[in-house]
Amino acid sequence: MALKIIKGNIFTSQCQTLVNTINCVGVMGAGIALECRLRYPAMYSRYLTLCKEQKIDIGLLWLFKGPDKWVLNFPTKRHWKGSSEESFFHAGLHKFAQTYRERGVTSIAFPLLGADRGGIAPSRSLEIMTEYLSTLDIDVEIYEYDPLAKDDIYASTKSWLLSQDAADIAQKTSIRIDYVYKLIEAMQHSDIHQLNQLARVEGVGIKTLEKIFVQARNQSFSEQETQQKRLF
């Protein structure tokens, strides 16, 4: 089957399974992990529990089956402050190559392991990954992160936020109104294209992002239900 190298946003992949790179101490605070935390809150909650029980470790892969995608959680660090090591990639990739069939994985999209915040050169990461993934009998995509790539949930969240009154948002989400204004201002910056990038804005914390995303998602679901009722 095909192995494709793509520069873009992994969340636009049509693959059945996406790979989320994680540490072993219960922190999903940046990059793809933060996106997964926002998109799959039940997975994040379970991840915290597994870390407390010390069941997340290098070489152990945890498959979460979400409503739209499966997510393969792949430890690339022991601690979020630490660096990735090539041996961590070998351990996880070997495990994946040995178990993907029995786990029911039919296609999968990986990020370049450790190439963003892990300290591993992208070329070296790709070399190691290709060694294990190029001979598999499923479609595999390897994504080189593109900070300019479009993000579907950012677009929908931005559309909702900019269509609302700031005071109403503050009341519905229990976010201080000055933080709401910071978010509104940040979402109009030309250099922000993805939800995880908002975390770098001063005064915008992860909890704030979670509250905004949940409110936007719930509003979207409510509108969809209303529209469906009108069809009958």
Q: PLM features: what roles do these ranges have?
A:
Residues 1-232:
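Macrodomain-like recognition of ADP-ribose-binding/processing modules
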